[in-house]
Amino acid sequence: MTNIYFPDEEVTVNDLYFVCYMVERIARQLKQPNKYVVNTLGKQALREKLSLANVLHCDNPDAVAYDWIEGYGLQPGEYDVSKVNPRYTDHIPTATQMGKVYSRLVVSTLQEGEDYADGMIRVYNHPICEIIDDYNSSAYYEPSYVLTRSYWAGSFN
């Protein structure tokens, strides 16, 4: 993907990882599904964030989250990924870990003609994300190739 502000630069996988991490962080803070954040930002804003990620990652993540929440009118909800059954797990993955999971899934399923923003919208709106984000299951820590295969199959079965 070409940087929209600096056409001679490419957006890197690390830039994608940062934006996926911020999506996860903001979604958790607002108690919203990840796809709410991605869909509310939209394709153009995602392209902007991806193009600025190499600079934004140096800022305080709380300040970046605040700017995105205020700038795009993101609202709190009731979706809380941290509510897990203690019989199944006693911890949840960090926002950085889930940012890595989702950035890998975007890259591994990127289709011809798509940029990272298109891939993010497609992946975060796929039903498989409801399973990945259910931390009572083990889906989120499956190897990348298993997540990719499950994405294309539409389930983990």
Language-model features, listed with the residues they occupy:
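N-terminal interaction modules that seed assembly of large macromolecular complexes
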Residues: 6-67
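Long, compositionally biased
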Residues: 1, 54-90, 94
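A structured, charge-rich N-terminal accessory region that forms the first stable segment of a protein
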Residues: 6, 10-13, 88-110, 119-132
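Glycine-rich, aromatic-bearing surface loops/beta-hairpins
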Residues: 124-157
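Intrinsically disordered, low-complexity linkers and terminal tails enriched in Pro/Gly
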Residues: 1-2, 157
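Short, surface-exposed acidic
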Residues: 31-39, 76-81, 112-117
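Amphipathic alpha-helical interaction surfaces
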Residues: 47, 51, 67-78, 104-111
